[in-house]
Structure formats: C-alpha cells, structure tokens
C-alpha cells in the first residue's frame, strides 16, 4: 500500500475511535441519569406504599377472623 492509503486508513480509524468515545460518554451519562431516576422512583414508591398502609387498614381478614368454609 502506498503511504497515502495508510494515512487515509489511519484517519478513518481515528475518526471512528473519536465517534465511539463520544457515543460511550453519552451512553454513560444516560445510564447515570437512569440510575438517579430509578432511585427517585423507588423512594417515591416507598413513600406511597407507607402512606397507603397507614391510611387504610387491610380489607383482607386475618386467618383467625375468617369463618370456615361450609364443607367443614
């Protein structure tokens, strides 16, 4: 191969590498944002669950309060 062909191939590889580095950085930022959003949503879900448990007693009777089925 001639020198110019090697230069061209090297330029192409450098260009691809730069693009890949940029893409990886963007993906990393997206993953970090998603992790923060998931943490926020988990905390919100925990708070809502606690609020729901405190606001309304369970509508399901405990085992001792249930009447036995008719076949007993």
Swiss-Prot record:
Residue intervals passing through the bilayer: none
Pfam families in UniProt: SlyX
Entry-linked HAMAP family: SlyX
Similarity comment: Belongs to the SlyX family.
Protein name (database record): Protein SlyX
The organism of origin for this protein: Erwinia tasmaniensis (strain DSM 17950 / CFBP 7177 / CIP 109463 / NCPPB 4357 / Et1/99)
Source species taxonomy: Bacteria, Pseudomonadati, Pseudomonadota, Gammaproteobacteria, Enterobacterales
